[in-house]
Amino acid sequence: MFLRSVTRAAARSSAVPTTGLRSYRTVSGPMACLNARPQTEKKSIAPQQTRAASEHAISNPTLAGIEKRWEAMPPQEQAELWMQLRDRMKVDWHQMTLQEKKAAYWISFGPHGPRSVPPKGENLKIFFKVAQLTLVSFGIFYVIHLFAKPQPKTMTKEWQEASNEYAKQEKINPIYGISAEGYEGKGFVQSPPAEKQ
């Protein structure tokens, strides 16, 4: 039984390739002796197809006014036109028309999409909006401080001067601070005098 199945399998996969497979087999393969004929069919098809797609210039009406029409074109048409230009750019650039060169440059680097120029007056709108929000933030700040508790008693000039005297008596920071010889700084004083009530 095993012998019969092996002979059937061997008959189905014969060592001699069919004509359909022969054109795609390389000469350096294990069946090189059976594939001694040159493979002209395979090599002649691909260059003709790519040459045919890229040798014909794209029509001028298609490329005329592309700067004005590009944003309004559907994405499918944009993709098709770009693919045509991409295939066209694979040939020598001296064979491309001036319209094709301009269109390829504009589609690649033109002011559309994320590179579009901002509309007129946008900078002025941004300035006014920033100024408006800054004024609102100052207003919120002063409203919060209006309803805040009064400053603590330690935030008066008199209290801070008394803190300076205490620091000198206790010789706090005698090297660089208020107790050092020749010290000329303000010490702890940082607030205005207390308001008289």
From Swiss-Prot:
Gene3D superfamilies: Cytochrome c oxidase subunit IV. Residues 148-197 are mitochondrial intermembrane. The keyword Transmembrane applies. GO terms for molecular function: oxidoreductase activity. The keyword Ribonucleoprotein does not apply. Pathway: Energy metabolism; oxidative phosphorylation. Residues 14-129 are mitochondrial matrix. Pfam families: COX4 (PF02936). GO terms for biological process: mitochondrial electron transport, cytochrome c to oxygen. One of its GO terms (cellular component) is mitochondrial inner membrane. It is found in: Mitochondrion inner membrane. This is Cytochrome c oxidase polypeptide 5, mitochondrial.
